[in-house]
């Protein structure tokens, strides 16, 4: 395989999964890094990455801002996985290129027709829509 899956069991650790083995160590490091940089996490990771951390602890200890990218289809907002993945990558580029330090500054992001939807966004959930 080209990557090691997190649900692989470790016989040497009593059958503990890779996720559960690394979770405490990664969470401690993650929290230390976030807090040392102002205590705000811009969450652009895919959903399965939450399994790597004690997400409840993360939510309790730092401010999380999650950008979301959705497309209008048939009068409803829908997540199109390939678009969401591409937008997350483009937003990372935007953050680096523009040296974004405040979550509020992400509202200026636009890409391939996706734009900030102020009406449907909150301080912790920034929605960008297409269509």
Language model features with spans:
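Internal, well-folded beta-alpha domain core
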Residues: 1-121, 131
């Amino acid at each position: 395989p080209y990557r090691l899956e997190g649900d692989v069991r470790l016989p040497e650790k009593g059958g503990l999964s890779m996720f559960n083995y690394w979770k405490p160590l990664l969470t401690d490091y993650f929290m230390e890094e976030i807090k040392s940089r102002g205590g705000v996490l811009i969450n652009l990771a895919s959903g399965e990455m939450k399994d790597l951390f004690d997400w409840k602890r993360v939510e309790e200890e730092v401010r999380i801002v999650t950008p979301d990218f959705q497309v209008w289809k048939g009068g409803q907002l829908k997540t199109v996985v390939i678009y969401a993945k591409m937008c997350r990558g483009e937003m990372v580029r935007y953050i680096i290129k523009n040296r974004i330090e405040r979550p509020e500054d992400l509202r200026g992001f636009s890409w391939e027709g996706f734009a900030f939807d102020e009406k449907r966004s909150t301080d912790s959930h920034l929605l960008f829509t297409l269509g």
